[in-house]
């Protein structure tokens, strides 16, 4: 049964879905790492693929940018396509010298000023949690492959372009600092909220693509094709 946003049938998706923001990164992962790949959806250019990795079925699908977008796609995957696990694999901007360009971050919580969870389910908190069992599997995969992980809270922002404010610190800066956020992205708070509401599992691996404490940045092509450590960690976990 297809949904308004996913043109697939039940059984087209594996129980575990890797979810980058960029649909072209989803295609790159499918083409580079998976065998017996088939495209299962492409509504609005949001590509999704199912194949196998080391003999295990796995799917990969783009989420788009921001919480409303990943909120729709992840909810439909969990609710209507019997997906049990979604691992976001995305890029992030570092808030600290501890997380340098191309480092891999494993989120232990997603902090946000967003009202996504309050509007959706009445949840009033400012932090949503990943699945601890999924995080344990990702840690084991990283250790097996010798890929270091930096762990901690991340900031899920609703806004990419913020206007200057006379208030110092601003609400989001205070929230970021109080929660000790390592980096900023725009999706995981909603993904974790969906998983909690629906009794499913979600996790988030991020590659540092730019920094608020360093002038270094990555190119669009690097973000699409070069963030392979987090891909290998997510693919290598035993779900």
Where are these regions (language model features)?
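Metabolite-binding pocket within alpha/beta catalytic cores that recognizes anionic/polar moieties
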Residues: 1-137, 144
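Glycine-rich beta-alpha junction loops
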Residues: 23, 93, 155-161, 190, ...
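Expand to "…catalyze enediolate/carbanion chemistry for C-C bond making/breaking, isomerization
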Residues: 79, 164-166, 217-218
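Short acidic/glycine-rich loop or secondary-structure boundary segments that cap or lie
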Residues: 95-97, 113-115, 158-165, 213
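Active-site rim beta-loop-alpha module in soluble metabolic enzymes
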Residues: 127-180
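Generic non-transmembrane alpha-helical segments
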Residues: 137-145, 194, 233-237
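A C-terminal functional module that forms or caps the active site or interfaces directly
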Residues: 166, 170-203, 209
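His/Asp/Glu-rich mid-to-C-terminal helical/loop segments that flank catalytic regions of hydrolases
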Residues: 212-239
């Amino acid at each position: 049964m297809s949904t308004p946003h996913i043109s697939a049938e039940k059984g087209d998706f594996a129980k575990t879905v890797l979810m980058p923001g960029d649909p072209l990164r989803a295609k790159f992962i499918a083409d580079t790492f998976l065998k017996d790949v088939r495209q299962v959806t492409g509504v609005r250019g949001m590509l999704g693929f199912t194949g196998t990795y080391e003999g295990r079925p796995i799917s990969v699908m783009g989420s788009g940018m921001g919480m409303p977008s990943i909120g729709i796609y992840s909810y439909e995957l969990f609710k209507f396509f019997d997906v049990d696990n979604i691992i976001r694999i995305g890029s992030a901007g570092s808030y600290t010298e501890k997380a340098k360009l191309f480092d891999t971050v494993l989120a232990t919580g997603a902090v946000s000023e967003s009202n996504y969870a309050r509007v959706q389910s009445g949840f009033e908190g400012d932090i949503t949690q990943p699945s601890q069992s999924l995080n344990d599997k990702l840690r084991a995969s990283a250790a097996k492959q010798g890929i270091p992980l930096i762990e901690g809270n991340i900031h899920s922002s609703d806004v990419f372009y913020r206007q200057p404010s006379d208030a110092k610190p601003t609400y989001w800066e205070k929230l970021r600092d109080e929660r000790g956020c390592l980096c900023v992205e725009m999706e995981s708070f909603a993904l974790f909220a969906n998983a909690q509401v629906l009794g499913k599992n979600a996790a988030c691996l991020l590659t540092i693509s730019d920094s608020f404490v360093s002038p270094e940045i990555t190119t669009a092509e690097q973000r699409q094709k070069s963030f392979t450590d987090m891909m290998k960690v997510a693919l290598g976990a035993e779900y």
